[in-house]
Amino acid sequence: MCIRDRDGANVEISEQVGMDNIYIFGMRSDTVLDMYRERNYNPMTIFETNQELRLALTQMIDGTVLPDAPSALQDLYHSLLIGDWGNMADPFFVLKDFGSYSMAQRRIDADYADRDKWNRMAVINTAMAGVFCSDRTIREYNDTIWHLDPLKRKV
């Protein structure tokens, strides 16, 4: 099953399989652009108010995730909450999307428990995936961009 954010390719996938057969999470692109423009995003607020997220991030640096190298994820932790090298904290809004992602994951867990529903969704996703195969994509690129003649070879 697909759990996807709201970027362009994922929108195309959802159009193929139907919104009932995909899990979408996260902000819309216009909201992301507004947040960049307004520069009022503070991931520390999310960290302080979301217990699930706070636990996950804390476990990144307290030895829970990597007991043999507890400081290995320190830079990531710091970049998500404070920023690094003069850059804004969490520039890809990972923490902002965390709540939405968690809700999508809970929907996945519930749907997985319903075997008939899960199997139907799996068949639909598999059947509708053909449009995204690389052969079709390359043919389309060639037809619309490259305009190359196919190579012929004896087999």
PLM ranges: what are they?
Residues 8-9:
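Phosphate/diphosphate-binding loops
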Residues 22-155:
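C-terminal amphipathic helix plus adjacent low-complexity
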